[in-house]
Amino acid sequence: MSRRCQVRGTKPEFGNNVSHSQRHTKRRWNPNIQKKRYWVPSLGRKVTLTLTPKAIKEIDRRGVDIVVAEMLTRGEKI
């Protein structure tokens, strides 16, 4: 599974761990990705999306139909 939010496009970020002696080693910060199913009335079916908690809140505020319509215009596969 890709560690990427389908709505917001959040991806892992990269940086360094820095020890007390200032030694740098590579690391990555993964986003908090959740799988969530929604009923989309405009499509007439359920869709499973990989989302971050911010995207879940955005869908709760704006509505699943509007967000899915924007995803489809972007060319996102659902």
Curated annotation (Swiss-Prot):
**Which parts of this chain are annotated as the region Disordered?**
1-28
Keywords, in A-Z order: Ribonucleoprotein, Ribosomal protein
Molecular function via GO = structural constituent of ribosome
Q: Name one GO cellular component term.
A: ribonucleoprotein complex
A Pfam family assignment: Ribosomal_L28
Gene Ontology BP, a term: translation
Q: Cite the SUPFAM superfamilies for this sequence.
A: L28p-like (SSF143800)
Q: Output the InterPro entries linked to this UniProt entry.
A: Ribosomal_bL28, Ribosomal_bL28/bL31-like_sf, Ribosomal_bL28_bact-type, Ribosomal_bL28_sf
Q: Which family does it belong to?
A: Belongs to the bacterial ribosomal protein bL28 family.
Q: Note the HAMAP family from the entry.
A: Ribosomal_bL28 (MF_00373)
Q: Which NCBIfam families match?
A: L28
Q: What is this protein called?
A: Large ribosomal subunit protein bL28
Species source reads Cutibacterium acnes (strain DSM 16379 / KPA171202) (Propionibacterium acnes)
Traced from the root, the source organism's taxonomic lineage reads: Bacteria, Bacillati, Actinomycetota, Actinomycetes, Propionibacteriales
- Quote the gene name from the UniProt entry: rpmB
